[in-house]
């Protein structure tokens, strides 16, 4: 039997060993519950096992799948960056790489003066929400009562 570890390090993130493997993997930024379950199935692991029982070989296998999921058999629609803007490849970015890619995408939209980029610049909602009553900032101005 493998020794139980309370903290397991996968892809540079500390995972809770007491949680089920699929829920523990969601602590990695860019990995949701469905993607985590797919990674477990492709790696040949039970998604319901406790993450603390992972061996070093199993951790390496999970990290390999997270680096290039499409080549390991995870479908193209499941990755978070299909047809990447710069490379044209299907990528799945996690942790700091995901943050950096999102920041670069917003900077590109601002640079080309796209509508979405301008909305980001102004700090306004980007996805078409109404702004009359929501997204207000600053002090609220009360209404004073009329003197008699």
Curated annotation (Swiss-Prot):
Keyword Zinc-finger appears in the UniProt entry: no
Keywords: Ribonucleoprotein, Ribosomal protein, RNA-binding, rRNA-binding
Molecular-function annotations in GO: rRNA binding; structural constituent of ribosome
A Gene Ontology BP annotation from the UniProt entry: translation
Protein's UniProt keywords contain Lyase: no
InterPro entries linked to this entry: Rbsml_uS13_C, Ribosomal_uS13, Ribosomal_uS13-like_H2TH, Ribosomal_uS13_archaeal, Ribosomal_uS13_CS
Top-level taxon of origin: Archaea
Listed GO CC annotations: cytosol; small ribosomal subunit
Subunit structure comment from the entry: Part of the 30S ribosomal subunit. Forms a loose heterodimer with protein S19. Forms two bridges to the 50S subunit in the 70S ribosome.
Family, similarity comment: Belongs to the universal ribosomal protein uS13 family.
UniProt function note: Located at the top of the head of the 30S subunit, it contacts several helices of the 16S rRNA. In the 70S ribosome it contacts the 23S rRNA (bridge B1a) and protein L5 of the 50S subunit (bridge B1b), connecting the 2 subunits; these bridges are implicated in subunit movement.
PANTHER family given in the database record: 30S RIBOSOMAL PROTEIN S13/40S RIBOSOMAL PROTEIN S18 (PTHR10871), SMALL RIBOSOMAL SUBUNIT PROTEIN US13 (PTHR10871:SF3)
Name of the featured protein: Small ribosomal subunit protein uS13
Organism, scientific name: Pyrococcus horikoshii (strain ATCC 700860 / DSM 12428 / JCM 9974 / NBRC 100139 / OT-3)
